[in-house]
Amino acid sequence: MIFRRVARGVFPMFGDGKTTYHPLYIDNLVDAFIAAMQLDVGNGEAYLIADENYVEIEKLVKAVAAALGVDVSIPHYPLFPLVAAGHVCETLCKPFGVTPPIFPRRVDWYRQNRAFDIRKAKRDLGYRPLVGLTEGLARTASWYRSEGYLPLPDIASASVR
């Protein structure tokens, strides 16, 4: 979980951090579903639903840190050893029915670009993502804290910032 790792203050970045990620805040997804249902369009059609813009993963990590109100160190490491470790772990764990701690799909977060074109949803459904990245991350951080997934902010240190 990105938020938990960032909250610890260090987020290891494998590769250059320029891989793109296209976030989607849940309210935006729900809005798209409601629009499709109310307009009764798109039967049998596929739509890509995402927030307005994609973001490089290092910038996403920094935005999560801002939403949490914490400083984060982002040391960079070469990607290849992680890719190799993912394949080795998966190969060794699979025969024993053990979920590997690292596997190729998890490593892909650092290396596969995910940037989508939402124009079709905008055109056909009138889709407009209303909650932007900064607000969505702030709401997510608040929810994680209220549900106990993240510690509450330290009031004393927060006031010093």
What is the predicted role of each segment?
Residues 35, 39-102, 118, 138-139, ...:
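Mid/C-terminal beta-alpha module of Rossmann-like enzyme folds, strongest
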Residues 120-122, 128, 132-161:
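Amphipathic terminal alpha-helices
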Residues 1-31, 35, 64:
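NAD(P)-dependent short-chain dehydrogenase/reductase
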Residues 10-15, 20-26, 90-114:
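Low-complexity, charge- and small-residue-enriched intrinsically disordered regions
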Residues 17-30, 46, 54-58, 115, ...:
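Conserved loop-to-helix N-cap of the C-terminal "lid" that shapes the substrate pocket in Rossmann-like
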Residues 7-8, 38, 69, 145-146:
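Residues at helix-coil transition
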Residues 1-4, 91-94, 148:
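Short, hinge-like loop/turn segments at secondary-structure boundaries
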